């Protein structure tokens, strides 16, 4: 089940990267949205690693996902200001 979500989020990230490459004037918003999906992929990967009893790698992925989400939140708020 996680694999389907990870693959769909990865496809969304690739599509957003291609859109950001074509529209250079709106990249700040697209990059923040792309970071949200990247964080979701990393979070799901962390949950999978925790299920495999690989707690160190799973915790690292979850912490990194939270960091990526906080960076995207900062990007959203800076774009609004």
Swiss-Prot record:
Cellular-component GO terms for this entry: plasma membrane
Mode of membrane association: Multi-pass membrane protein
UniProt keyword annotation of Ubl conjugation present: no
Transmembrane segments: 4-24, 61-81
Alphabetical UniProt keywords: Cell membrane, Membrane, Transmembrane, Transmembrane helix
Keyword Glycosyltransferase included in the entry's annotation: no
Annotated compartments: Cell membrane
Major localisation: membrane
Pfam families, A to Z: DUF3953
Protein name: Uncharacterized protein YczI
Species of the source: Bacillus subtilis (strain 168)
């Amino acid at each position: 089940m996680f694999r389907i979500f990870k693959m769909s989020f990865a496809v969304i990230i690739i599509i957003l990267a291609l859109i950001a490459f074509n529209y250079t004037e709106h990249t700040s918003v697209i990059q923040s949205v792309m970071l949200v999906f990247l964080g979701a992929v990393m979070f799901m990967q962390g949950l999978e690693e925790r299920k495999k009893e690989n707690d160190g790698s799973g915790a690292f992925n979850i912490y990194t996902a939270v960091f990526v989400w906080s960076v995207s939140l900062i990007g959203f708020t800076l774009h609004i200001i």
